[in-house]
Amino acid sequence: MTPLLITLLIVAGIALLIVIGYLNNVVENGKIERVRTRIELADRLRRCGEITETFPGQFMSPALKLLLTRLELNLNQRQLAVDKHNAELKARITELEGLIALGDQIPVNNPPNPIHTEVKAKDVRFLLEAMHNQVTRAAQEGFLPAVEAKHWVKEIRHILVLLHIEFFNNLGQQALQKNQPGQARLAFERGVQYLRKQPEPKVYEEQLTYLEKLLARANAQVMDRMAPAEDEHNELTDGLKTDEEETWKKKVMYD
């Protein structure tokens, strides 16, 4: 065997090892990518399902329910492409396709969930943020047209405003029921200020007028409490009158 042939065999062997290593790396990267995709899609599906199931009914419209169902269907179809033999995914896809076929008649079974506490308001706000992320991600991936995505981003912001209106209104009404006009005034005042800062305040003109009336009512109750009645006598008012009389007598004596 000539030295040239030996050299060629060595070079061929090295090249073969490089090719094998490259192919193994490609296969391994493909497996890792599939696992990563499966985990990411599962997380997005979980978040989408959480929004669909727990979003308060007073903010959930058939159009919004239909959007969330479409987003969930898209994620399930992509996950099925990675896990082709998953019977559970196939069944869910069939169910979602049936719901989407109903269009605006899609059932909305979310019960109303009044926003009475700041904790509850934050929970719903987090759901809205998750919804916003789902919409923008779907637009970036080409599933949602840009015009439709823009519409839903605006609608999500509108729902956020409605959330604040309900929160401040409920907070103030609770304070009035507890005979705490000061706390009620603070809640209504926050609501009024929030609406006045909106980019399009005319959209919420009716709600603003309503909160302003409640603010005036709470403020009147606070002022009534602060002003003593004309015929009311207590230790403080009597003490003040006594001090005024003593001061007047001393002034007369020294003058």
Task: Name every feature range the model reports, one short phrase each.
Residues 1-39:
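N-terminal signal-anchor transmembrane alpha helix of single-pass membrane proteins
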Residues 17-22, 133-157:
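Repeat-mediated protein-protein interaction surfaces in helical alpha-solenoids
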Residues 23-128, 132-135:
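N-terminal topogenic membrane-targeting module
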Residues 32-35, 148-167:
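TPR-adjacent "capping" and linker segments in tetratricopeptide-repeat scaffold/adaptor proteins
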Residues 61-71, 139-147, 188:
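Helix-turn-helix repeat elements of alpha-solenoid scaffolds
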Residues 85, 99-111, 138-145, 159, ...:
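Alpha-helical linker/edge segments of TPR/alpha-solenoid repeat scaffolds
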Residues 167-255:
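Long, non-transmembrane cytosolic or organellar matrix-exposed soluble domains/tails
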